[in-house]
């Protein structure tokens, strides 16, 4: 009788060890981030900076800014990407000279920059870009590669630590092999780290995360279906979103950067956070809801080991008195951001 009993004990012990190890693996994904990016999305200025414009960022605990040069596409269904290399019509802060100067000023103040080029699509948004023929797809990727390599070379020369290879190009990211070629081309001229900024509806479908250093998410997740939600509801929503994100993190073993996150100062900010301010003009203003959305994020996703950083949309060189708006500047959300960024 002793032998079967001993065997049973060994089986139960092995099962307990196996269960413990699996639970530990579930709790610890194995990603260790030394210092999270405490970032904001910097708005390129029309005119040259004087230097003081970045002073307040340090006092709010900001460690990084993302700078955004633009390319333009007139029709989302035609391969016609254009960008300005030198033009008097360009805003200074979006030019190579302006971004270089902004980076230098920031570094003097302990603030690093990442580069995040965007495509501006006339009458639409980048997520609708889709070619109707295979020939046009090849032309589009050829043009896009030239566009992103132009800025990757600038980033290499400027010692920019991270380049975002694309932003919200949802219909194009289905073409995995094309994107792998783009990534390969970028790595041939740029030695820093790479991220792709996937729309929150897109990141789970992307299959080339393994070729990048970070999983990037434009984190405009809907958090509520009503105006003026309370903090408990927002926290619950973020906990659910975090569990979904963790599935992708476990699959690819890559840290996440929220390449954008933001909320307007309106009562409906948590319903569809991505909606532009000019579509919210009839909605009552609410600094409280905006601040609660910030608080819910910081109490949940911000604490995750897999989150390498966040960039809040958006921050003006000179504060603007325009409501509604995404910026936390001079609002209650700014105080929430500072309290966590300063920890």
Q: Residue spans of the language-model regions?
A:
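Boundary/entry segment of secreted carbohydrate-active catalytic domains
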Residues: 24-59, 68
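Aromatic-rich peripheral "rim/lid" segments of glycoside hydrolase catalytic domains that contact
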Residues: 28-31, 84, 275-279, 291-296, ...
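The substrate-binding groove and active-site-proximal loops of carbohydrate-active enzymes
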Residues: 39-44, 80-96, 133-143, 166-173, ...
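Short, acidic/polar
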Residues: 44-58, 141-154, 199-208, 291-300
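Aromatic- and acid-rich polysaccharide-binding/catalytic face
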Residues: 148-167, 198-236, 255, 259, ...
